[in-house]
């Protein structure tokens, strides 16, 4: 495969490549010498389960494997005990060694649902970081300045707002960067929020007389709400170890707009096939629900197998039919709101009832369902993001969409 063909695959879904020309030269050299590039991506095992947000990087790693390159799946068992401060307004609570190792074992089991185990090198950064002396660590710290660290957006904001920044948090980008030195990485992948740390890796490789790694940043996958980064703490995630029915149902609940983003970042369909699907949806030849089912089947099959995917679809269709929810229904577009919104108000906004008070009475009488589930709490509040299917009585439906 030519350099141009490889670059077309590598660019898919990527936010930024630093530096693109440099990466092209590395691929050209790899093709001429037959020596594969070494691709690195690190994951701190701060929680036991991987979710679809993590798999954006894993899919890009698999693409590199398919192009014939070597992939290093780095488990940050050492850095996980420090806690990545990226995007945080306060110091993260450190994990114990026991917690980190327990989570790391589950990562090893889960990643091979995506990566080819025969082409994957699994490494733990404690192998080299755990052997560093105090002198080594001071030498590493000497490679940067406080001013440089404050260029990081989150550190800069905390400093400006007079919020504490621990010294060990300044060390995190340097330690992550040193991983690239230890592995002699040619390319490092990371989320857009990791760009600063990835560039520190380039700087440190120059210090250690290595060729600086190319950096590829990937977008942060939005969670089920379509607004926030997918996160277990926000409850808007899809875990790859969740039951097949649950994964299928969660994917069917996302907005049509978010579905197309999931196709681009999570599906094995080519970009041409995705564009064809978009056109078919625009022309009315393919209903969005059918497109979601296709995506849900693909993702469930990846983690649970084709039979489980078929069964999950049958189960979803059966539940959908039993609830008699129509595919077509009135849609009410509302501006996304911070906090929560009373269900009674949403019923009125959707035109299912004439007033908020009538909505509360309908809820009390057991005549209202949200996403197929009966609701009896007339003071129920729903997050002002994402989508909801509201049902009043047996025949009246409306879809609420927060944008």
From Swiss-Prot:
Domain of life of the native organism: Bacteria
Enzyme type, top EC level: ligase
Entry EC number(s): 6.1.1.1
SUPFAM superfamilies: Alpha-L RNA-binding motif (SSF55174), Nucleotidylyl transferase (SSF52374)
Residue intervals passing through the bilayer: none
Protein name: Tyrosine--tRNA ligase
GO biological process, one term: tyrosyl-tRNA aminoacylation
Binding of ATP, residues: 232
Main location per the UniProt record: cytoplasm
Reaction equation(s) it catalyzes: tRNA(Tyr) + L-tyrosine + ATP = L-tyrosyl-tRNA(Tyr) + AMP + diphosphate + H(+)
Family: Belongs to the class-I aminoacyl-tRNA synthetase family. TyrS type 2 subfamily.
InterPro entries, A to Z: aa-tRNA-synth_I_CS (IPR001412), aa-tRNA-synth_Ic (IPR002305), Rossmann-like_a/b/a_fold (IPR014729), S4_RNA-bd (IPR002942), S4_RNA-bd_sf (IPR036986), Tyr-tRNA-ligase (IPR002307), Tyr-tRNA-ligase_bac-type (IPR024088), Tyr-tRNA-ligase_bac_2 (IPR024108)
Gene: tyrS
Subunit note: Homodimer.
Subcellular compartments: Cytoplasm
Domain S4 RNA-binding positions: 341-402
Motif 'KMSKS' region per UniProt: ranges: 229-233
A single MF term (Gene Ontology): RNA binding
Motif range ('HIGH' region): 45-54
SMART domains given in the database record: S4 (SM00363)
Keyword Ribosomal protein: no
GO CC annotations, alphabetized: cytosol
Signal peptide region: none
